[in-house]
């Protein structure tokens, strides 16, 4: 099998679409976290420790998502620059994209777990 370690135009175009999708998804997740946080604050809590813990988890998830969003944006900008300057040998861009893919996957898992915990807590607090 012949491995190509070049960021050809097709690969760069794919990565740009991938990054755009990630940025959109993270933005949607952050908007939903804002909404869930609002619901969390609007209900009466029997145990403030649970609410406080969930608020801390929301804050952490929001910070992690913001950092990931920034990293994706930097990669996106780099790929556009590579494309515009016809750089096809930016091996680091390939590695960075793979690392970002793993970070996005982990971030999504944490988000889903937090979302489920929040939905459960909110639904039992009425």
Region roles according to the model:
Residues 1-126:
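Charge-rich amphipathic alpha-helical interaction elements
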